[in-house]
Amino acid sequence: MAMTLLEDWCRGMDVNSQRALLVWGIPVNCDETEIEETLQAAMPQVSYRVLGRMFWREENAKAALLELTGTVDYSLIPREMPGKGGLWKVVFKPPTSDAEFLERLHLFLAREGWTVQDVARVLGFQNPAPAPGPEMPAEMLNYILDNVIQPLVESIWYKKLTLFSGRDIPGPGEETFDSWLEHSNEVIEEWQVSDIEKRRRLMESLRGPAADVIRILKTNNPAITTAECLKALEQVFGSVESSRDAQVRFLNTYQNPGEKLSSYVIRLEPLLQKVVDKGAIDKDNVNQARLEQVIAGANHSGALRRQLWLTGATEGPAPNLFQLLVQIREEEAKEEEEEAEAALLQLGLEGHF
């Protein structure tokens, strides 16, 4: 659970999870100064900066995300550190060592009947690199890692798309178009490769009629881009919805019971963008439309909704999506801390009886 939180938090802040620490088990009543003093005392030789703190409801405690800012000796990072209220837990993902990585690479290539020289030749290098070994100079090893192994890793180990065929009844392992498209857009954005490679990976996920559509388009236009392929699939297999229908669906989407307001805003955003794409809302008015619907659709009756109402009542421009989420998340964190403090106070009162 802690590792999942570390990975999700890093992904949300665009931070390399192998350059971050998650410290948790911090008491709710522990302030920023106490947290910093504890971290410095436990890791005096580790260079870091605190990216943020949050209340972790499942643990009824705070958690802090740290980014490692310098050269790191992971042996200096404790798995636990003494702090206020007891031991604080530390979670991190140390990167795989070069030796372990090379060993795993050799095993993989051996199973496939390949050598590093074969890989270099396939990738188009004029002078195939020698096989890496412990006696190899550091400059040559770095060259192989950067120019041979890294392209190989990127082309073999990557997050794959789910399957989509376009059939009326999806087959085993296949998804409906809307869920497939949403997942595909997220994954494709993460791929750090050429558009040609993205298109190849996209084709891997297609079956049946969907694959036939892209093959026909590629035959007519060999230079078709990945974005154009996705657009064509949306036109063929996407739901046919008028601008009026899209707007009605957007305006009738409300916050669910128990759903965080920030989660509601994120769930609302694709519906808003669809309304904008169909021309029902002008792009210049998208921030105002979002704010008005969040105020109207929220079932939150506390200070957070009042603050949003005051934001909408001001004469200034409405906040954009990022600004709105930051405002909401900050208020949610305050409310969670207040709830936790109230719960602790209640437990203390009950302990006196």
Swiss-Prot record:
Entry keywords, A to Z: Nucleus
Cellular compartments per GO CC: cytoplasm; nucleolus
InterPro entries: PNMA, PNMA_C, PNMA_N
Location within or outside the cell: Nucleus, Nucleolus
Tissues and organs where the protein is expressed, per its UniProt entry: Testis and brain specific.
Principal location class: nucleus
GO BP term, example: inflammatory response to antigenic stimulus
Entry keyword Nucleus: yes
Family membership: Belongs to the PNMA family.
PANTHER family in UniProt: PARANEOPLASTIC ANTIGEN, PARANEOPLASTIC ANTIGEN MA1
Record's protein name: Paraneoplastic antigen Ma1 homolog
